[in-house]
Amino acid sequence: MKILAIHGAWSSSISFNYLKFKTKSKIWTCVDYDHRVDDWHNILNKSVGIIREPYIAIGHSLGGMVALHMSQDANCKGIVTIASPLTGLDLNLLQLYLSRSTLISAIAKNSKHIDEIHNLSYSHLPVLHLVANKGYNPFIYEANDGVLPFKVQTGWSCGEIYEIAANHYEILQSDATVTAINQFLKKRF
């Protein structure tokens, strides 16, 4: 099964190198975007139709939210989100103002994009949410993975939730992540 991989904000497709090497699927297509220029719609447009045969969409962080949108593509046969802000980011006005990024506001709690994702149907395909449950950020006063609060990754779901003992970035180099993805692929494809 082919993989469509969408990286997180302020990252690149290089972040998937370990998973590409270790997972059973060796046919990966990565969507690259530039967070300084591309907005939510540009990233979606770069992702839609890039693979014209059956594939699994895998996204890390913001990329996981884009992967969920791919459920509307007839060729998308499954989705794996990795450390993604499934409920949307819980931001105050100061954080929104200081972020200087349209990507942050696009995935803020109650944004139109998060509402769209929550209102899509996922009953026609399997979804796996891999949640990073280790990490520390002194500015987040609750359990977090170093970037996202735990509750943001688990407060909404449209599939199975599986916790990985890693922080927000280590989860992409975790053997537990490789195992979970391989089991997801083996069980369903």
Please provide the spans of the model-predicted regions.
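Short, Lys/Arg-enriched, disordered terminal segments
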Residues: 1-2, 49-50, 185-189
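Serine-dependent carboxylesterase/thioesterase catalytic core
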Residues: 3-7, 14-17, 23, 28-31, ...
